[in-house]
Amino acid sequence: EVFIDGGDAYSEFETNALGTTYQVFFIWRDAYKKGGVFDIPEFDIFKNNALTFGGDFDRSDQYFWVGTHPRGLRWAFLNWQFPGLLHASHVDGKINDNSVPDKGWTVELAFPWKGMKYLAAGRSLPPKDGDIWRIFFGRFEKLMPGGVELNPHPAWVLSRHAVYDTHIPECFPFIQMSNQTVGR
């Protein structure tokens, strides 16, 4: 999973070893205003069937429609696709066959800067050397020991943020952009 915070909005991208993807664009409801940056056809809540979203673990009857995040609810655009995104998966093993030891799988992602237009929040695109963005990188695995699904699903993340809900942008790690070549 990759979540990119844009202040008043954030995007979610998920993929699996088969290359199946899931993408959503979230806009905080307090930021969705007539004449605002998100008041465009791409984010028309009626034409695009936007859903109300409270958070990953706010699905109990008590919080489902109101959420528990201090900022409130988000509009979730499930039909949104990150502009120009490229992705590929490679499996070194046999998917869903526990009789064959796997070596692993890899994924390669390319998020074009121009596709981050609504996530830039006034920041330069591409970012300048030293700019800081909040981006969550995580991996979740559905395990079924003895045929029973383990919940919550085990997770590996770039930076631990002490809550299981990945929809808290203020907990995403700080990523500093750099013009330096890696390894130098």
Put a short name on every predicted segment.
Residues E1-R184:
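Structural preference for beta-rich elements and adjacent junctions enriched in aromatics
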